[in-house]
Every structure is written in structure tokens, then in C-alpha cells.
Amino acid sequence: MKVGIVGATGYGGLELIRLLSQHPNVEEIICYSSSQEGLPLDDMYPHLSGNVRWTLKAIDPEAIRADVDTVFLATPPGVSGELTPDLVKLGLKVIDLSGDLRINEPDVYEAWYKRQAAPVGTIRGAVYGLTEWQRDEIAAAQIIANPGCYPTAVLLGLAPLVQQKWIDPKRIIIDAKSGTSGAGRNPSQITHFSEMNENFKIYQVNQHKHTPEIEQQLRNWDESVGNVTFSTHLVPMVRGIMATIYAEANQAISEKELREHFAYVYETSPFVHVYSEGRYPATKEVFGSNRCHIGVTYDERTNRITVVSVIDNLVKGAAGQAIQNYNVMNGYEETLGLEGSPLYP
């Protein structure tokens, strides 16, 4: 199959190129850009130099339809909301890595993103692509709203608890840390080397755009879930997310039962690994991979469950999960093109 990447010059688009280049069922990758049409992508990014000349093409829905079967949209907020309706009318499958189609209610999207929402019909036609929990829906979908990086780590960590109603749904606290690539490619003061090196900072306190996405999906599993406390931090590394999640148990449970339940739930999920007693994941253990590693513990003294969930924000949190969804949409093995081990050290 031939695939297109709109927004190929950002970190998410570049990661799509890296991973799709290794996919045995992808015969050609065509890259599109709104501002750099005609430029050789491998001149901008020498790591892409090799046998293929990655020349950027203009974004034109009719031309894209003539080129490819599936389009990955790795675009800034607002772009895919405008582009997706035209692509869908032309019969293309669309996997959107932006936040434009993740929030079901337009007024909620507009309140958090401070921009006009996509057409309601497009939003409602999109399937939220948290692969481990939406396989059947994804297999039948034409449009995938690929989850955000933080929500991926958080939701995979919380799903086994929320679905079983084992925790107080009104008192969920999420403390998350991310590498600087999560802030995107465009330079800013917050990601400037002199500001970030040997530093650790909280940002978008009580205002992170991924908050309503997390709450929406949690409420799909348990409508009694309240507003979550969600804190995000930047740490001086390039890749990786660690979400440490705290919740109060609402029934008697042992740590052994917790771990066994997590392991059972994710037994058929090739990219999710649940750690054994006394072990907790580190971001380096998933670096460059589509994996999510999870550790869970229960503190009898405080009656709190702690879940630690780590992913690579550019892979499982973006491009890798998008390709995982692409595989499911097309009836391929879920792991196709994503089998590589994490980079270590």
C-alpha cells in the first residue's frame, strides 16, 4: 500500500517516516507540506539520506487521493479539522495525530484549544484509537483520532482500575513528566537548552489540553469519574513520558490481586508489559519502541494504589500507535513494522 504523511517535517512526521520505512506492507511513502513544497526533506534532515529522495509535495486532497490509500496527519491543531472532511469524501482512510478529532463535544474542544472545532460530523465519525481497548472499532473505522502522548500513558495505566471500579472515581491524581520533544519542533523559551538543561519544570498547570481527553475516555469506562488532577512537567531529556498515577482503593484488595489483574488484562496486548512485584519501569526501557511498561503497587497504610506507566512519546505516544492502528484498520498483524526492541543504553 501507498501511504501519505501530511506534516512530515515535524517530530511526529519524521518518526512516521522512520517506522513506516520498515513496514513490509508499505511500498511507498509520500510526504506533504503546506509551507515547504518542493524542498528535499533529506536536505533538511540528513539522517533521512539514502536510497529515497524525500521531496515534499503540496497539500491537495485530489492529488493525495491519486497518490495514496491512507493518510497520516501529523499537523498542528486546526489543520486536520479542515482537511479531514475532504479526504474522507474522497474515500481515503485518515489517521489524525493531532488533537482535532479526539474531543467529542465541540464546545469542550474550543474551551481547551482556543480555536474552532472540526465539523461535528467529522468528529463523531472518528474512532478514538487507543488500540489496546478499541480494536474492533478501529478495524471498522475510516477515521482514527490517534490519542495524545500523555493520555496514552495515563489511560493504559488507569483502564484496568477504572473499568473494574476498584478506585474512588472522584480522586484521581496524575503526575506526568515528558521529554522536550513532546513540546514539538518549533523552538521556544521553555525548550531552549539554557532553560532546560539541568532543570525540571512544571508547565500548563491545570490547563493542559490533554486533560479533557483523559477525562472523556475515563468516563466512557465509568461515567462517575470526576475531574482529574493532572500535572505535567518537562525534564531534560529528548524522549519519554512517565505518568505516576495515584488513586484511593474503594474496596479491599491486595497488591498481588492488582498485578495479576493488570497482567490478565494486557495478556493479549503485545506492546504492554506489566512488571513483577517490587519493580517499576523507567523511560529508558521503552526508548525508541512502541511499548508501554507498567508497574503497580498498593500502600495499605494510605489505602492508595500507585501506577507507574512509561512510553516513548514519539512512538507509542504518536507515530507508533498510529501505525499500530493502521495495522488493525487493514487487517494486518498488530505488531507489523513495530517489532523493534527499545534502544539501550
Swiss-Prot record:
PROSITE patterns, alphabetized: ARGC
Biological process according to GO: L-arginine biosynthetic process
Keyword Oxidoreductase: yes
GO CC annotations, alphabetized: cytoplasm
Active site: residue positions: C149
Keyword field: Amino-acid biosynthesis, Arginine biosynthesis, Cytoplasm, NADP, Oxidoreductase
Main location: cytoplasm
Broadest EC class assigned to this enzyme: oxidoreductase
SUPFAM superfamilies to which the protein is assigned, alphabetical: Glyceraldehyde-3-phosphate dehydrogenase-like, C-terminal domain, NAD(P)-binding Rossmann-fold domains
InterPro entries (alphabetical): AGPR_AS (IPR023013), AGPR_type-1 (IPR000706), NAD(P)-bd_dom_sf (IPR036291), NAGSA_dehydrogenase (IPR050085), Semialdehyde_DH_NAD-bd (IPR000534)
One family name in Pfam for this protein: Semialdhyde_dhC_1
Cellular compartments annotated: Cytoplasm
Catalytic activity, EC: 1.2.1.38
Catalytic reaction annotation: N-acetyl-L-glutamate 5-semialdehyde + phosphate + NADP(+) = N-acetyl-L-glutamyl 5-phosphate + NADPH + H(+)
The protein's annotated pathway: Amino-acid biosynthesis; L-arginine biosynthesis; N(2)-acetyl-L-ornithine from L-glutamate: step 3/4
Classification via Gene3D superfamilies: Dihydrodipicolinate Reductase, domain 2 (3.30.360.10), NAD(P)-binding Rossmann-like Domain (3.40.50.720)
One GO molecular-function entry: N-acetyl-gamma-glutamyl-phosphate reductase activity
Function: Catalyzes the NADPH-dependent reduction of N-acetyl-5-glutamyl phosphate to yield N-acetyl-L-glutamate 5-semialdehyde.
Family: Belongs to the NAGSA dehydrogenase family. Type 1 subfamily.
PANTHER family assigned: N-ACETYL-GAMMA-GLUTAMYL-PHOSPHATE REDUCTASE, CHLOROPLASTIC-RELATED, N-ACETYL-GAMMA-GLUTAMYL-PHOSPHATE REDUCTASE, CHLOROPLASTIC-RELATED-RELATED
Protein name: N-acetyl-gamma-glutamyl-phosphate reductase
